[in-house]
Amino acid sequence: QAIGDLADDVTIEMLSDQPSTRSPTDTPMWDAIGRAVQAADPDASVHPGLIVGGTDGRFYRPKGAVVYGAGIFSPTVDMADFGSRFHGNNERIDLDSLRLVTDFWDHVIRGFDDLVAP
Protein backbone atom coordinates (compact mmCIF):
# COMPACT_ATOMS: atom_id res chain seq x y z
CA GLN A 1 0.00 0.00 0.00
CA ALA A 2 2.77 2.43 0.91
CA ILE A 3 4.35 2.28 -2.54
CA GLY A 4 1.05 2.52 -4.39
CA ASP A 5 1.26 2.07 -8.17
CA LEU A 6 4.94 1.08 -7.94
CA ALA A 7 4.09 -2.24 -6.27
CA ASP A 8 4.28 -4.17 -9.54
CA ASP A 9 7.77 -2.80 -10.23
CA VAL A 10 9.25 -3.51 -6.79
CA THR A 11 10.87 -6.73 -5.64
CA ILE A 12 11.18 -7.27 -1.91
CA GLU A 13 14.02 -9.52 -0.84
CA MET A 14 14.42 -10.87 2.70
CA LEU A 15 18.04 -10.23 3.70
CA SER A 16 17.83 -11.82 7.12
CA ASP A 17 15.24 -13.70 9.08
CA GLN A 18 17.09 -13.56 12.39
CA PRO A 19 14.99 -11.97 15.11
CA SER A 20 16.34 -8.98 17.00
CA THR A 21 18.03 -9.75 20.29
CA ARG A 22 17.93 -7.73 23.48
CA SER A 23 19.64 -7.55 26.83
CA PRO A 24 17.91 -7.00 30.18
CA THR A 25 18.04 -3.61 31.88
CA ASP A 26 18.09 -4.92 35.45
CA THR A 27 21.84 -5.60 35.54
CA PRO A 28 24.85 -4.03 37.27
CA MET A 29 26.23 -3.02 33.85
CA TRP A 30 23.03 -1.15 32.96
CA ASP A 31 23.24 0.62 36.34
CA ALA A 32 26.89 1.51 35.71
CA ILE A 33 26.00 2.93 32.29
CA GLY A 34 23.19 4.97 33.86
CA ARG A 35 25.52 6.37 36.50
CA ALA A 36 28.11 7.28 33.86
CA VAL A 37 25.47 9.09 31.81
CA GLN A 38 24.30 10.98 34.91
CA ALA A 39 27.90 11.95 35.71
CA ALA A 40 28.28 13.44 32.23
CA ASP A 41 24.86 15.11 32.18
CA PRO A 42 22.66 15.11 35.30
CA ASP A 43 19.60 15.92 33.15
CA ALA A 44 20.09 12.89 30.88
CA SER A 45 18.57 9.46 31.31
CA VAL A 46 19.17 6.03 29.79
CA HIS A 47 16.49 4.21 27.82
CA PRO A 48 16.62 0.96 25.86
CA GLY A 49 16.08 1.23 22.14
CA LEU A 50 16.60 -0.37 18.76
CA ILE A 51 18.88 0.80 15.99
CA VAL A 52 18.96 -0.05 12.33
CA GLY A 53 21.87 -2.33 11.52
CA GLY A 54 23.48 -4.98 13.60
CA THR A 55 26.30 -5.66 15.98
CA ASP A 56 28.17 -8.72 17.11
CA GLY A 57 25.90 -8.65 20.16
CA ARG A 58 23.34 -10.64 18.19
CA PHE A 59 25.75 -13.60 18.31
CA TYR A 60 26.64 -13.27 22.01
CA ARG A 61 23.19 -12.67 23.51
CA PRO A 62 21.84 -16.13 22.52
CA LYS A 63 24.85 -17.60 24.36
CA GLY A 64 23.83 -15.78 27.55
CA ALA A 65 25.97 -12.62 27.34
CA VAL A 66 24.55 -9.23 28.25
CA VAL A 67 25.50 -6.80 25.48
CA TYR A 68 24.82 -3.06 25.28
CA GLY A 69 25.84 -0.40 22.81
CA ALA A 70 26.38 2.94 24.50
CA GLY A 71 28.30 6.16 24.13
CA ILE A 72 28.20 9.89 24.68
CA PHE A 73 28.88 12.38 21.94
CA SER A 74 29.39 16.12 21.93
CA PRO A 75 26.26 18.25 21.64
CA THR A 76 28.11 20.19 18.94
CA VAL A 77 27.98 17.18 16.59
CA ASP A 78 25.57 17.79 13.73
CA MET A 79 23.11 14.89 13.93
CA ALA A 80 22.44 15.16 10.19
CA ASP A 81 26.15 14.40 9.66
CA PHE A 82 26.44 11.91 12.52
CA GLY A 83 25.68 8.69 10.63
CA SER A 84 28.18 9.45 7.89
CA ARG A 85 31.02 9.53 10.41
CA PHE A 86 31.08 5.78 11.02
CA HIS A 87 31.87 2.71 8.93
CA GLY A 88 32.58 4.51 5.69
CA ASN A 89 34.90 6.88 3.93
CA ASN A 90 36.53 9.46 6.19
CA GLU A 91 35.47 7.66 9.39
CA ARG A 92 36.08 10.08 12.25
CA ILE A 93 35.12 11.43 15.65
CA ASP A 94 35.54 14.98 16.92
CA LEU A 95 37.96 15.55 19.81
CA ASP A 96 35.26 16.66 22.26
CA SER A 97 33.27 13.46 21.63
CA LEU A 98 36.44 11.38 21.97
CA ARG A 99 37.07 12.94 25.39
CA LEU A 100 33.44 12.49 26.44
CA VAL A 101 33.19 8.85 25.36
CA THR A 102 36.59 8.01 26.92
CA ASP A 103 35.52 9.56 30.23
CA PHE A 104 32.16 7.80 29.92
CA TRP A 105 33.70 4.32 29.53
CA ASP A 106 36.21 5.01 32.31
CA HIS A 107 33.28 5.88 34.56
CA VAL A 108 31.33 2.78 33.44
CA ILE A 109 34.25 0.46 34.17
CA ARG A 110 35.01 1.98 37.57
CA GLY A 111 31.31 2.13 38.43
CA PHE A 112 30.74 -1.47 37.40
CA ASP A 113 33.64 -2.56 39.59
CA ASP A 114 32.11 -0.68 42.54
CA LEU A 115 28.76 -2.40 41.94
CA VAL A 116 30.05 -5.97 41.70
CA ALA A 117 33.24 -5.99 43.81
CA PRO A 118 32.96 -8.14 46.95
Residue ranges and their predicted role:
Residues Q1-D106, R110-P118:
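Metal-dependent amide/peptide-bond hydrolase catalytic core
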